[in-house]
C-alpha cells in the first residue's frame, strides 16, 4: 500500500540464509510500515515457501500464530521486553525475550514485531540488546520507528535498516485512486500527509480541515477577517493542537516558497 511494491519485493527476495535477525523499518506515520513488517514476518514464518502449510497463513491472518508475537503499545517498558515472571498469557505476563527463548511451536522460526519501537525507554532497549547480540538461529525481531535515530546506536548496529520515503504527489494520487478515493487528491492535504493519514482523515470526516485552515489564514492575511475572528476560527478547527502547529508550519513553508519564487499564493 503506502510502501512501494519494489521495496517489499526487495526485502522478501533476500535469501533466507542472509536475512538478519534484527530489522528496523523507518518511515513516517501512515506510510505503511506495519504492512511491510507483517509481510516480512509472514514470509519468515512460512520459511519463504509460499506453498507451505496453509494453516500458518490462516493463523497469521487471524493474529493467533503461536510463533508470532506483536507488541503494539503506547508505552514500552522493560517488563514488555524482559520480565522475571513466568510467561502467562491469561495473566498478561508476556515479554519479547521469553517468547524468543521458547522453541518454535509449528513454524521453523519465531518472529517478534515491535511497533513504534522508538517508544521503548532505555531500560527496555538495553533488555532487548542481548536478543539482538546473541540471537537463537530461529528468532527474528522486526521493529518499526516513526523517527530516524530514535533508538540507541548499539541497536542500529545489530539490525538492517529499511527506510521508507514519503510518496510524491503523483504516487499518492495513484494510491488513492487504487483504494477507490476519487473525490480528493494529495493537494487537498498538507505535504507531510501520508497515504493512511489521508485515508483516516477522510474516514473520520476531517478531510476539509487543512483547506479550512488555508482559507482562514488567507482571509486573515488579506484583512478579510480580524485577529479575534481568526483566533476563534482557528480554535474551532477540529484537530488537535499538534496538528494545528503542523498546519502553521506548512503554511509558513508555502509563504516562504511563494516569496522565493515571487508567486502569488
Indicate residue ranges for each PLM-predicted region.
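Clamp-loader machinery-focused feature within the broader ASCE/P-loop NTPase space
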Residues: 5-9, 13-123
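Charged, glycine-rich active-site and insertion segments that engage polyanionic ligands
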Residues: 5-9, 13-43, 49-61, 137-139, ...
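Conserved adenine-binding aromatic site and its adjacent loop/helix in ATP-hydrolyzing domains
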Residues: 98, 130, 153, 157
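A generic secondary-structure signal
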Residues: 99-103, 131, 175-179
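Conserved catalytic/switch belt of AAA+ P-loop NTPases
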Residues: 101, 126-143
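Short His-Asn-centered micro-motif
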Residues: 115-116, 144-146
Amino acid at each position: 500500500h503506502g510502501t512501494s511494491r519494489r521495496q517489499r519485493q526487495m526485502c522478501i527476495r533476500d535469501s533466507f540464509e542472509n536475512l538478519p535477525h534484527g530489522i528496523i523499518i523507518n518511515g513516517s506515520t501512515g506510510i505503511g510500515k506495519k504492512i511491510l513488517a507483517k509481510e516480512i514476518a509472514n514470509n519468515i514464518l512460512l520459511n519463504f515457501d509460499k506453498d507451505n502449510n496453509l494453516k500458518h497463513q490462516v493463523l497469521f491472518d487471524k493474529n493467533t500464530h503461536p510463533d508470532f508475537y506483536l507488541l503494539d503499545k503506547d508505552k514500552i517498558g522493560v517488563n514488555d521486553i524482559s520480565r522475571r515472571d513466568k510467561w502467562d498469557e491469561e495473566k498478561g505476563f508476556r515479554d519479547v525475550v521469553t517468547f524468543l527463548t521458547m522453541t518454535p511451536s509449528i513454524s521453523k522460526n519465531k518472529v517478534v514485531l515491535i511497533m513504534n519501537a522508538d517508544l521503548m525507554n532505555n531500560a527496555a532497549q538495553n533488555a532487548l540488546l542481548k536478543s539482538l547480540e546473541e540471537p537463537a538461529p530461529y528468532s527474528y525481531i522486526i521493529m518499526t520507528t516513526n523517527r530516524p535515530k530514535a533508538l540507541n546506536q548499539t541497536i542500529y548496529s545489530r539490525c538492517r535498516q529499511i527506510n521508507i520515503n514519503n510518496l510524491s504527489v503523483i504516487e499518492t494520487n495513484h494510491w488513492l485512486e487504487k483504494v477507490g478515493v476519487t473525490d480528493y487528491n494529495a493537494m487537498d492535504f498538507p505535504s507531510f500527509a501520508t497515504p493512511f493519514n489521508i485515508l483516516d482523515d477522510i474516514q473520520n470526516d476531517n478531510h476539509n480541515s487543512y483547506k479550512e485552515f488555508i482559507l482562514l489564514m488567507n482571509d486573515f492575511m488579506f484583512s478579510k477577517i480580524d485577529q479575534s475572528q481568526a483566533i476563534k476560527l482557528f480554535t474551532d478547527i477540529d484537530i488537535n493542537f499538534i496538528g494545528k502547529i503542523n498546519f502553521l508550519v506548512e503554511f509558513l513553508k508555502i509563504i516562504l516558497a511563494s516569496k522565493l519564487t515571487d508567486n502569488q499564493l
